[in-house]
Every structure is written in structure tokens, then in C-alpha cells.
């Protein structure tokens, strides 16, 4: 494979295997045209209660240095995206989706496997409760990549004012022991990702 990666800047890197090539480009300009493609995938892949308005995503690209967006492509064709946050000691993956037109080809697993290799930090993400076949499959997808499901009760704050808190679960990759750091990680996500004021977390 060929790659360029800086853990501080997360600028650009390409993931290669014998079967596929997935390129990941860091999006730094809130007016970058690829954000139009990402917006489409974002709104198609996640229900409204699990995402913010995309205009706010663009604002984060412009204003928040800890917020990261990657456009995924294969053979110069857009196939999906990853968004996340850089925190002390770990990276939080907020949203990860493959465009519907590019699914079922192993691109998602390939991209995430290589992202984990090059990320250089432990990773935390949220998943829906395993209450149906789709949510169970999603958890299984991450478990096959080496993630561990934490069974402590976690609530995702609402993205929109007046919305409901959603019971979810956290999954971790690498050296993140939620048995000891659950409250710290939860409070960090609630405060920085969702804007929950101190003392109002669940």
C-alpha cells in the first residue's frame, strides 16, 4: 500500500489491498463540492434523530478544529464518508456510511480496517441497541473489525432542541477501558459533540 498520514492533521491517505483501493481525503473547506455528495449519503443513511442538520456539519468543518470529515473514494469515484472528533487519547467516530450505490462490495470493512490502522489512537463510537436484525448486523460488523461492545447504559443526547434522548451503546477499539472511563468518555461526548451543559447528562 501507499499512504501519507499525520495523526495531528489527518490530511490525506490511501488504503490499498490486493482486492481494492480506498482513498480517504480530509475535507477542510466547508464549501468543498464533495460535501454535497456527503450530505446526500448522510441524510439517506441516518434517521433525522441520529444526525444534525447538514448546515451545522459545514459550520463545524469551518470552525471546529477537532471535527474531522473524510471523503472516501474508490477508483476516483465517491463511495462514502467518515466524520469524527479528535479527543485526548481517542478518536470518536460520529458518522460512517457507504453510499447506497457502492454498498455490498466490502468497501466499508476495508475503509474502516485501514482507518483503524492509520488512526493511531483508540476509537469510540455509538451504535443502536441490538433490538432488530439490522442493528445486530451493524454491531457484528464492528465486532468483526475488533471493536468491543460495552453494555453500560448510554443515552445519546438529541441533535435537535426538544428531541428525545436515545438509549444506545458504546463500542470501543484499542486501549479504551470503559469499565473505568465510561463517565469521562460519556461526559466528553455529551459536552463537545452534542453541546449538553454540565450537570445535564444522563
Predicted regions, residues:
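Conserved GNAT acetyl-CoA-binding A-motif
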Residues: 119-131
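Active-site rim helix/loop that mediates acceptor-substrate recognition in acyltransferases
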Residues: 46-74
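Conserved acetyl-CoA-binding loop-helix of GNAT-fold acetyltransferases
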Residues: 98, 104-117
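Conserved beta-strand in the GNAT
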Residues: 71, 77-85, 90-97
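Short amphipathic alpha-helix that is part of the acyltransferase structural core
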Residues: 17-56, 168, 180-200
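A contiguous, mid-protein "functional segment" used to position or interact
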Residues: 149-182
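Conserved active-site alpha-helix within GNAT-family acetyltransferase domains
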Residues: 129-152
Amino acid at each position: 500500500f501507499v499512504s501519507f498520514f499525520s495523526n495531528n492533521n489527518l490530511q490525506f491517505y490511501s488504503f490499498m489491498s490486493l482486492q481494492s483501493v480506498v482513498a480517504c481525503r480530509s475535507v477542510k473547506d466547508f464549501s468543498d463540492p464533495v460535501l454535497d455528495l456527503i450530505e446526500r449519503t448522510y441524510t439517506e443513511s441516518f434517521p433525522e434523530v441520529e444526525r444534525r442538520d447538514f448546515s451545522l456539519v459545514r459550520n463545524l468543518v469551518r470552525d471546529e478544529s477537532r471535527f474531522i470529515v473524510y471523503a472516501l473514494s474508490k477508483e476516483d469515484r465517491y463511495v462514502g464518508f467518515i466524520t469524527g472528533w479528535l479527543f485526548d487519547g481517542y478518536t470518536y467516530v460520529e458518522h460512517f456510511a457507504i453510499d447506497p450505490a457502492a454498498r455490498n462490495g466490502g468497501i466499508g470493512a476495508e475503509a474502516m480496517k485501514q482507518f483503524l490502522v492509520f488512526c493511531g489512537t483508540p476509537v469510540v463510537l455509538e451504535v443502536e441497541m441490538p433490538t432488530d436484525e439490522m442493528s445486530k448486523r451493524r454491531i457484528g460488523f464492528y465486532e468483526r473489525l475488533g471493536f468491543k461492545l460495552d453494555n453500560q447504559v448510554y443515552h445519546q443526547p438529541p441533535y435537535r432542541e426538544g428531541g428525545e434522548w436515545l438509549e444506545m451503546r458504546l463500542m470501543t477499539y484499542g486501549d479504551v477501558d470503559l469499565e473505568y472511563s465510561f463517565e469521562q468518555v460519556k461526559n466528553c461526548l455529551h459536552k463537545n459533540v452534542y453541546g449538553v451543559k454540565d450537570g445535564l447528562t444522563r
